[in-house]
Amino acid sequence: MITAFLEYLSLEKKYSVHTITAYKKDLISFRDFLVIEYAQENLLEVNYPQIRSWVVALVETKISNRTINRKVSSLKSFYKFLQKTKQIDGNPLSKHKALKTEKRVQVPFTSNEINAVINHFEKEGQSEFVSVRNKLIVELFYSTGIRRAELINIKERDVSFSDKTIKVLGKRNKERFVPLLSSVIQTLNRYLELKAAFAIGLEELFITEKGNKIYETLVYRIINSYFSKVSSKQKKSPHILRHSFATHLLNEGADLNSVKELLGHSSLASTQVYTQNSLDVIKKVYNQAHPRSHKK
């Protein structure tokens, strides 16, 4: 039953492996809860009070309401699938209301912080391969705004040196082409020279020193480690670099629709999240420049 749902997400919905794995973990977690608390294995006979008790149990683990809502959303999608395939008559989660969550304010890195990290690589006591690879990862995140999952799945063939672009496979396997800066291409050329000594013929662009495909946890550690040296911000992750990319473009007057395409968003509403920081900049300039801004 769960397997059929996961296949549906992969084949019909075109969800990424990362997303499908998250769904699988959530569903197995709920199934295990049913077995332990109710000695019940049949997911077709679930009622809302049982689901509610699972939510209460999750709340007691002190994980965030946002994470709980995501887990419940996975379960709701699963039961929608069962309803669609006529395995159940109604969705036991149809009237469920999400837990209240605080609005998250993503604080982007400043351009000075990003430049400090990029310039810091030459001073690192690492092998040249690791240093250049890590520098390329930072430059690529900031200059293209790609997601972490997109970065680790880039193949060498996705890079076009003649067009100065890189092909990115986004959510639901949607392709987009993102331009590359000359400085990034320079770093990329050097990285490919060094990579050849570690993994000849491996199609993945980013690899470990052992010649294996790079993985998400390592990418996170790279970003967190370098930015911890230059930034006091609470959150230092690949997503904050993506957020910085969008915010800085908008601050410099980039068109919202263009930023939407670069980020690979399916709707403009997703991109508008990044306009708040740009609005803050506009307000600051307005208050500093308007002749009557200091009058009471």
Model-derived features: positions:
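Conserved catalytic core of the tyrosine transesterase superfamily
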Residues: M1-K296
